[in-house]
Amino acid sequence: MKKFLALLLSAMMLLALAAGCGENNTKGNNDSDKTISADDIPDEMTSEDGKYEIAFITDVGALKDKSFNQGTFDGVKLYAHANNKTYKYYQPANDAQATDDDRYDAMAAAAQNGAKVIVCAGFMQANALVKAAAEFADVNFVFIDASSPVTDANGNIMNNVAAIAFQEEQCGYLAGYAVVMEGYKALGFAGGGGGDNPACCRYGYGFVQGANDA
């Protein structure tokens, strides 16, 4: 599990570098000297045995949202490609109106389709993830956007769940600092998801502090 997390996070951090390469490589090229970007790897693949070892459960919104979903799934694809693993993404039913049951159904489908690791993006996955992780105890879950260890209904830490939090405030700080250094002084911030979205609020706090420090 630790090895998977280290490689997944490394892949996600390398995403920006890979995406910045000006020349795409031909799919299937095994030349280790060539850089493969996430865009070179298909979003969907066909497993010979119908099983998919790594699953990604999307947050609300489109897979290609240029944000949490896309960044996380690109990391999954890069890891799977580098380690010859099968992968599949699942989008809970009803999109923005998805319920905990919808999210659980997506996780259960992933586990039943052979997933050994299920990566879930977004804090709204919490209730469904706790239920799924308890039922599928032999599957490892990666909870993206969780700021503390995940516990079960009895308050016990779930050993098959790894919690990873984005540090949005650091990204916001750099953005705020950079925009002022570029000469812009009349600033505003409009965060997506409304005023009660913790991730957007953290980004906004960082943005204001970065602009102030500049």
List PLM regions with ranges:
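Bacterial lipoprotein signal-peptidase II cleavage site
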Residues: 18-32
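Hydrophobic core
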Residues: 9, 13-17
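Positively charged n-region of N-terminal signal peptides that target proteins for export
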Residues: 1-9
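Short, well-structured alpha-helical segments in soluble
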Residues: 98-114
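Flexible loop/hinge segments that line or gate small-molecule binding clefts
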Residues: 134-164
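Extracytoplasmic "Venus flytrap"
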Residues: 36-49, 54-79, 90-103, 122-125, ...
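Periplasmic-binding protein-like
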Residues: 112-123, 142-144
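An alpha-beta-alpha
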Residues: 76, 173-214
